Structure formats: structure tokens, C-alpha cells
Amino acid sequence: MLSGDQLTQTLTTAIKNGDAPDLFCLPGGVKLSTAVSEGWYQPMTDYLSQEFIDSFSPGSLNEGVTTLDGEIYVLPEAANIVNSLVFYNRDIFEECGLDPDAPPETWSEFVAACKTITEHGNGKYYGIIESGSAAQRLEIELRSFANIAGAKCNYYGVMSVVDGQNPFASDAMKSALDIYAQLAADGSIHPDSINLDAPSARAMFAQGQAGFLIQGSWCIPTWRAENPDFNFDVMALPVPDDGAKGGNPYTGAQPWMGISATCEHPEAAALYLTELYGTDYQSKIVSDGGFVSCIEGVNEEAMSDPMMLKYYNLAMSSGKLSPDPLALNPETAEVYSQVKEVTPNLGQIVQGVMAGSITDTAGALDTFSADTQAAWQAACDAAGVDISAFEFDDWDPMADYDYSK
């Protein structure tokens, strides 16, 4: 199984070599506007029935996200929910004298639990195992912790500013990164983490090598199939000791599958998509667990796994819909196409903290924030878009953002 980063690299190489499949997903980190401008996809609206288009839940097909100038280019894979909840091993909890029915709720309780598990494990297991080679996963986690502390840093890959500035040097972001610094200092992070992709970390967690794992609902069906006796549970991401000042951020359904511009039989490709998103197939994959459909009415009827239902309910209660500039201000698409990535990025900074190569966490974030601000401003200038298009004064991070305003 390919990790997200590996899939992105494989797809991008195939597309640039002219070997793209007839149907392919939008590579991670690539905006739809960029893909369309480079001739990767062809519009599919003419090949889809209105009944099919209307079957998607509200917010699934948005201008600037799945659609450009009224033409649908890609479809979302699933409804987007929080994918950074915390799984924990109930058996390890009991072995370490922790109550599996009362998991940690605050940052200090979480760090303390990780330390207790690590000390009790004595090399057999550790407090937490991370997908350390997947910078994207680490950035998603860090943004989640920071947003809960009030950073208003939005979801992975989304540009947001507060008073015209990015939030990456905020006190909330710095305190979130300090969690990883403390876990590393305590020796609570599994030592193999820095080299692990998400599937490997997931597998080792199920083998009893750590007390905690931060990932998404996709873990559940894998463990049901491969580790049927694994005694796991799920909890919300812990909040700061003085209480949450935001929710775990997520945006609306994201772009996924489109028809290649080189596809010679787009009608057949569209027919495949019609079946893929049909109620029968969507109901089956929802009932299998680990999947939340973007087709209206399917989730309520088909979700049957109790752990998946618990994950879904926690995601809905702790997660808060954040503003997506692409959906709210479509002109921002040109900014995204112009912006240059700053390295090390947030995920790579977390990697450095885990590995011990970054000890000045505040300084690392200050530098990243300054470099990012310059890159964002340059992209805005090149696109002729004011940076205020990425600022949402009406955004209360403790509530779902109201897209109807």
C-alpha cells in the first residue's frame, strides 16, 4: 500500500510523462486550478446526469474546489470529517494502571499518560507511535492541536490569516509544538516513528507497540480485518489545560477523482463514476466501516460498526468546519497556484523535533512564519489578490463556519 506522499509522487510522475490513467485522483498538495490549467483533467459535467449531480450532499461540489467556471472537473472521495482523533490500546491502559474508560482529556494528562505507558513498557511499548516519515500527517496533527488552542490555523494546505498575518508563530502554535518536544524529551515517542509511514505505524500500533496513535477512521476496517482481537478505543484530541479555544478543524468535501484530459472514452469513465457513487456501492463501503459517504442519506442508513459510529460522533462533536478560501473566494485559486512552498514545512519541523535536530521550537516557528508570510504575500501580489481574501473575521473556531453568510 502506498502512503499519501508516495501516491502523490507516483501520480505526478505519470501525468508529466503522459501516462496518466483515464481516471485519477488529484495528487495531494495540488490545487484543482493548477491541474486544470496544466491540462490534466477534462470537464465531466456533460457526461453526468442532473439526478447524479443532485445526489451529492450539500457542500460536496463547490466552485473552486471540485468545479471551475461551473464545470465539474473532479468529484470528492468522501464526506470530509476530522482525521486526527486519538486511538488507544485498552489492554495497555489496564496494564499501566490507566482507566480505559476515562482517557486523558487535557494536554498535560495526555503527556503524562504517554510517559506512564513508556515507563511501564520498558522498551516493549511506548506512549505514542507516529507516522514520522509522512510530513503531511504530522502537519495535520500539529494544526489540529494548535487550532484547538485557538490558533485559527485552519486545515492542512489551507491558507488563513489573522489580522493579515499567518498564525504559525502564534502562542497557540508554539504551545502545540511543545507537546511534541515534551513527548520526545520524555522518550514517549516510539523510536521507529521517524522512519514510519502511516500504514506501518497503524500496523505496529495494532501489534501492541504503543498506547496511542493519531490517525483517521480508515484504521478501523483494517484492524477489523487484520487484527480482529485488537482491543482498541478512540477519543477526541486532548485540549489545553485551560480549555479548548477552538475545534479540530476540517473543511468541506475535497477534490478527488477526475477524468484525464487524454481519456479517449470519457462517457465510459463517467459511467464508472456513476456506479462508484451509486447508493448500492456507497452503502456497502460505509457498512464495512472507516468510510463516510458524500452521497445524501447513505451514512444514516448504512453505518453499522459501533467503533466507526463512535469515531463519527466524536469527529462531529469535536470537529469544527473551517472556512475554505477556495469555496468562499474563488479568486484565491490563482494565489494557490503561485505560492512557493517553504521548507522545512510544519510537518518537517515536527520531524526535526522528534529526531532531536530542532531544539529551539519557538525559533523554528518564527522563521517558518516569516518565510511563509513573504511567500504568501509574493503569491498574492503575483495573482493580484489582496491577502485579506484569506481572512475571515466572522470565523469563530469554536463553531462550524457558516458558509451561507
Question: Residues of each region from the PLM?
Answer:
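Extracytoplasmic "Venus flytrap"/periplasmic binding protein-like
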Residues: 1-59, 63, 94-105, 204, ...
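A structural signal for short loop-to-beta-strand junctions that line the ligand-binding cleft
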Residues: 14, 21-22, 53-92, 244-250, ...
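Short, solvent-exposed loop/beta-turn-alpha elements that line the ligand-binding surface or hinge
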Residues: 45-59, 103-105, 149-175, 225-227, ...
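Extracytoplasmic/periplasmic substrate-recognition and gating elements
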Residues: 17, 96, 186, 225-293, ...
